[in-house]
């Protein structure tokens, strides 16, 4: 995972929101970023020299708050030297399929366009 993070140009964090947070499985994988945190704040080194852009995609079955999950995902992107280009949050997926949400589909297209044109 770490070698991919260092090589890629863009990173998209995608997760369902459970109990107002990204999934435990995503957090378990991303806990490997502790090495980046230590490099930056303890050893005073740049852990991922290649700057990149990123984005966050969050889904939720209900209409609960998204702030905690979004904050966690944004913090993880920063640890990977990503400048976030935005978040797409889709809620009520238990009631309305994403394919029926033209507003969300447009937000995703807009975010994809920003990723495509980012340097």
In which residue ranges do the predicted regions lie?
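Glycine-rich phosphate/pyrophosphate-binding loop and the adjoining helix
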Residues: 74-119
């Amino acid at each position: 995972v770490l070698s991919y993070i260092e090589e890629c140009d863009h990173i998209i964090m995608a997760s369902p929101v459970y109990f107002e947070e990204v999934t435990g499985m995503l957090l378990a994988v991303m806990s490997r970023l502790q090495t980046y945190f230590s490099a930056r704040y303890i050893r005073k080194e740049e852990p991922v020299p290649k700057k990149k852009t990123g984005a966050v995609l969050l889904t939720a079955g209900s209409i609960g708050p998204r702030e905690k999950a979004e904050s966690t995902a944004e913090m993880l992107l920063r640890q990977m030297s990503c400048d976030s280009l935005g978040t797409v949050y889709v809620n009520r997926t238990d009631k309305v399929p994403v394919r029926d949400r033209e507003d969300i589909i447009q937000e995703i297209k807009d975010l994809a366009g920003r990723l495509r044109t980012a340097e």
